[in-house]
């Protein structure tokens, strides 16, 4: 798969329409987590140092094609200026004469932020006319929003086909990390898939069993796989209507030579609360009035052994009810093992998904992972083997 990067473009004096994801959490008009903004610094710095004029295109919230003042991007200007160390101008449109005038007035070293692309219904409809009006504002298109690449919108798909297009530094890093973990990985490859429900990760599981050597299943979905083997899981979270599907996934894994690792022992409790009385029992011995809330120490030891024998790790979803202690132990211990192996240069570790990032941060392991995707839905769709419109539009 080939795409151009900033290195392939002549940027001097050019207006570069740069699609970014600055859909950040805010309270009282202030940004509460600027992670997504900080991850754009390499691209913006590169554009400025090469004499380009960065013109930022972004969405915020779900205004559904109408102008919703509370979803204006203007309040983000101070956070952008702080992160980029450069003046950020703002214009209350993303097309038309006002936007064009603001682009033309941009001085070297300045950045322009256009208004929320979703204020126009044409954005989410991938409207060709809106894309043409956006294209009139720039010379080059740069997509640095992998997290929005699974949506075919005017600013991510149609626009990319109207101007010379390239990937920004964040997009480039994300694509390299994901290609390296799934398309051309160093083997053996292990995937950890956790979380509550099999039903939400069917496509993911189906794609992974054909591509990885070991699939570690944890969280609530492990209970469904245990139930599929005829094991009584008591009052545990379990999708009993999905046991047939779980059996099918196990059969497909066997046919593909993929080993599925399920918990051999589990931590059970009778109440779902922090510090609840709990005990560790074999996976097939959950009391009828108890629920499985975490993988046990023998299971974690088996997972750690698999990690140590692997060269590549893909992680999506926690191994237990990580939000409440002590049912965070399996997730924390396994994450710390992966971090240790990564630091030692023995493992390439890639993780993504909201709960996953929160769990790895809680374990103090996130910093050591080779790559952590902030992309959520786009990360999952890539892992499911789906074509992402925003990436396909950049392909050369």
Curated annotation (Swiss-Prot):
ATP binds at residues 201, 323, 353-356. Substrate binds at residues 21-23, 36, 59-62, 118, 151. CDD domains: Phosphoglycerate_kinase (cd00318). Its main location: cytoplasm. Pathway: Carbohydrate degradation; glycolysis; pyruvate from D-glyceraldehyde 3-phosphate: step 2/5. It catalyses: (2R)-3-phosphoglycerate + ATP = (2R)-3-phospho-glyceroyl phosphate + ADP. GO terms for cellular component: cytosol. One of its GO terms (molecular function) is ADP binding. Keywords: ATP-binding, Cytoplasm, Glycolysis, Kinase, Nucleotide-binding, Transferase. GO terms for biological process: gluconeogenesis; glycolytic process. It is found in: Cytoplasm. Its EC number is 2.7.2.3. HAMAP family: Phosphoglyc_kinase. Belongs to the phosphoglycerate kinase family. Monomer. This is Phosphoglycerate kinase. It comes from Ruegeria sp. (strain TM1040) (Silicibacter sp.). The gene is pgk.
């Amino acid at each position: 798969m080939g795409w151009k990067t900033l290195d392939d473009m002549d940027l001097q004096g050019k207006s570069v329409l740069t699609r970014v994801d600055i859909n950040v959490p805010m309270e009282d008009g202030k940004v509460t987590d600027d992670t997504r903004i900080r991850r754009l610094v390499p691209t913006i710095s590169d554009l400025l140092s090469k004499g380009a004029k960065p013109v930022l295109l972004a969405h915020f919230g779900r205004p559904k094609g109408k102008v919703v003042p509370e979803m204006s991007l203007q309040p983000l200007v101070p956070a952008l200026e702080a992160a980029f160390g450069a003046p950020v101008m703002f214009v209350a449109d993303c097309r038309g004469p006002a936007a064009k005038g603001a682009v033309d007035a941009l001085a070297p070293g300045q950045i322009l932020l256009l208004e929320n692309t979703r204020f126009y219904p044409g954005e989410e409809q991938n409207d060709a006319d809106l894309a043409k009006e956006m294209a009139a504002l720039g010379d080059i298109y740069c997509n640095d929003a992998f997290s929005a690449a699974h949506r075919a919108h005017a600013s991510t798909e149609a626009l990319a086909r109207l101007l010379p297009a390239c990937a920004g530094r964040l997009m480039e890093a994300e694509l390299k990390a994901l290609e390296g973990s799934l398309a051309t990985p160093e083997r053996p490859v292990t995937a950890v898939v956790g979380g509550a429900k099999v039903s939400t990760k069917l496509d993911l599981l189906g794609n992974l069993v054909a591509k990885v050597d070991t699939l570690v299943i944890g969280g609530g979905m492990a209970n469904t796989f245990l139930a599929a083997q005829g094991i009584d899981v008591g009052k545990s979270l379990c999708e009993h209507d999905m046991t047939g599907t779980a059996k099918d996934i196990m059969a497909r894994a066997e046919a593909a030579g993929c080993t599925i690792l399920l918990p051999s022992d589990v931590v059970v409790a009778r109440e779902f609360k922090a510090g609840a009385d709990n005990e560790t029992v074999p996976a097939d011995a959950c009391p009828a009035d108890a629920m499985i809330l975490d993988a046990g120490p023998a299971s974690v030891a088996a997972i750690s052994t698999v990690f140590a024998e692997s060269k590549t790790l893909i992680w999506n979803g926690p191994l237990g009810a990580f939000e409440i202690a002590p049912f965070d132990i399996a997730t924390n211990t396994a994450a710390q093992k992966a971090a240790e192996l990564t630091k030692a240069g023995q493992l390439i570790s890639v993780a993504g998904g909201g709960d996953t990032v929160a769990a790895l941060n809680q374990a103090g392991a996130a910093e050591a992972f080779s790559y952590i995707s902030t992309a959520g839905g786009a990360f999952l769709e890539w892992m499911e083997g789906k074509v992402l419109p925003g990436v396909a539009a950049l392909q050369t």
